[in-house]
Amino acid sequence: MADRNVLGGELEPCGDDPVTGFYRDGCCNTGPEDLGSHTVCAVMTAEFLGHQRGIGNDLSSPVPAYQFPGLVPGDRWCVTAANWLRAHHDGVAAPVVLASTHERALDVVPLAALQEHAVDVPANPGALED
């Protein structure tokens, strides 16, 4: 069975430049090894990156040992649900691609919070509630 996104559809890729995902497969897939739940497909902003650095999660600096290139504003990256939620509470949440955000993110983050920051909302949002 295919992984599902927070809207109930098939999980879409998040990013391939740089290649994201806990499994470095371009998707915000998760599994038992992913203890941090890297399930939110976020579009990096300077504010979000600065916030993450401030809480001890430096996403800007490369870490070659983990195939991590370091991120810049505009990059799409699978971030942990807890860190995204913390940024949301602190007023600096990164925009979210709902179709690429794994349904397991909902174990931590309310759907309404994700929708508030969605960048892939269709012209008719009512169509999401079929």
Segments predicted by a language model, with ranges:
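Glycine- and charge-enriched low-complexity intrinsically disordered segments
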Residues: H102-D130
